[in-house]
Amino acid sequence: RRDRWELALLNAALERDMPVLAICRGMQLLNVAFGGRLIQDLPGHRTESPNGRWESTRHQLYISPGSKLAAILGAGGFVSVNSLHHQGVGEPQKAAALMASAYSVEDGLIEALESPSHGWVVGVQWHNEIEKEVPKNFGNLFQSLIERAETYAQRKEAIPQQSELAPL
């Protein structure tokens, strides 16, 4: 039920060309919404602490210099980020309509996706909201999303009527 509801919300946003920042499971959902698949179980991308909670690990990734993500962050290249997921997207699973813009150096998994056919649709596998675990310039992702959302909100069709998004 959660997947259906989240896919419906994501598809409604995509149809309206709303800006979308999809984080972790959101990036995976973005790939599925565009017709891609997931690797179902990835060992080593998170650890379990003694209290039973999942904790993030760290790994290196490479951000493609010509990508939208690199433009938002101000640079491409190698960076270290957190990892806290057990599913993921590799090249064979990636939706054809999406562009991979960052890869894990260790295992080649896709760490960021973007939609070239939308104004601002970016998905990242890491948890950008955990500021202490990402480079400082990664805050640009949120700032760029806010700016795009403000621009979008000024358009007449920006806010859908509640009846358009009926529960599943």
Residues covered by each model-derived region:
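Amide-donor transfer/coupling interface in amidating biosynthetic enzymes
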Residues: 2-16, 43-168
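Catalytic nucleophile loop
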Residues: 5, 12-37
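Class I SAM-dependent methyltransferase SAM-binding "motif I" and its flanking Rossmann-like core
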Residues: 40
